[in-house]
Amino acid sequence: MTHSLRVIFAGTPEFAAAALAAIHEAGFPVPLVLTQPDRPAGRGMKLQASAVKRYALEHGITVAQPPSLRRAGKHPAEAAAALDLLHATPHDVMVVAAYGLLLPQEVLDLPRYGCINIHASLLPRWRGAAPIHRAIEAGDAETGVTLMQMDAGLDTGAMLHDARVAIAPDDTTATLHDKLAAAGATLIVDALVELERAGALAATPQPDDGITYAEKIGKHEAALDWRKPATVLARQVRAFDPFPGGAGTLDGVTLKLWAADAMPARGDAAPGTIVDAGADGVVIACGEGALRVTQLQKPGGKRLPAREFLAGAPLAVGQRFSPPDTAA
């Protein structure tokens, strides 16, 4: 089936690529895709295209990669060229998903139907850069995807559609990301079909109650504070997979801790102390309860199940992980 609604798409990572693919495969014309410039990545730090760019090029869609869209920003010439391209590209609506660049009012005002953002939370909870991570870290039972009519604020626009997604007890950011990407892809296609048919989408202002902000994840957050309850640390480990991972420093060596679950305390060992180390996992005393780590990684190594890790790097009962403020 083909559609007449013309969609400019702006996005960068896999979450956005899933939406672009759904829009394209549903038959909506996509005359232009905006995505971030190629970035160095991997061990060789070679320039790599974004997931959105890869999809667009594979399907013959024109791609633009301005470093900024702000005429008065650090890249005025590139921004002006991109804005000229937007003005010259006939379109009806812009769909934005994890683009990573600020859209100035000039861009928001350009499409006939404005700009629709696909946000990976149930707004107004978890506005901001890392909604998936923060939902798991906070112990939320569910999250979801919200389609929002973009305005000048940070995820403050009126809500158009949403879809709820349960957070499973073993969900990591990686697994939940994929569920939300699929939900967002379905949601945006349904909304575009409705927009094309009806000429408008019902918009509901975000409530003032329940607003929270999902701050960007920093590498420093990987360090586990063993004084916290094990339930909190288990959520942190799941929330920070695949980035930045959980981390603990043992005898001056920082280990990545990739999978863990909370369990009752064993004895009265000080927080950070290993109280058991076997095939079922490495059990570490916490401020409340204990954390059983079942997947570990040493510097330069691979993620390994506890059994395999211990075969090559034995850990002993009584060893103690350093508190994060003294690990350096």
Swiss-Prot record:
InterPro entries: Fmt, Formyl_trans_C, Formyl_trans_C_sf, Formyl_transf_N, Formyl_transf_N_sf, Formyl_transferase-like_C_sf, GART_AS, Met-tRNA-FMT_C
EC number annotated for this UniProt entry: 2.1.2.9
Keywords noted in UniProt: Protein biosynthesis, Transferase
Pfam families noted in UniProt: Formyl_trans_C, Formyl_trans_N
Cellular component, GO annotation: cytosol
Binding site residues for (6S)-5,6,7,8-tetrahydrofolate: S121, L122, L123, P124
Gene Ontology MF annotations: methionyl-tRNA formyltransferase activity
Catalytic activity: L-methionyl-tRNA(fMet) + (6R)-10-formyltetrahydrofolate = N-formyl-L-methionyl-tRNA(fMet) + (6S)-5,6,7,8-tetrahydrofolate + H(+)
Stated family: Belongs to the Fmt family.
PANTHER family noted in UniProt: METHIONYL-TRNA FORMYLTRANSFERASE (PTHR11138), METHIONYL-TRNA FORMYLTRANSFERASE, MITOCHONDRIAL (PTHR11138:SF5)
Record function comment: Attaches a formyl group to the free amino group of methionyl-tRNA(fMet). The formyl group appears to play a dual role in the initiator identity of N-formylmethionyl-tRNA by promoting its recognition by IF2 and preventing the misappropriation of this tRNA by the elongation apparatus.
Listed name of the protein: Methionyl-tRNA formyltransferase
Organism whose genome encodes this protein: Burkholderia thailandensis (strain ATCC 700388 / DSM 13276 / CCUG 48851 / CIP 106301 / E264)
Lineage start: Bacteria, Pseudomonadati, Pseudomonadota, Betaproteobacteria, Burkholderiales
Gene expressing this chain: fmt
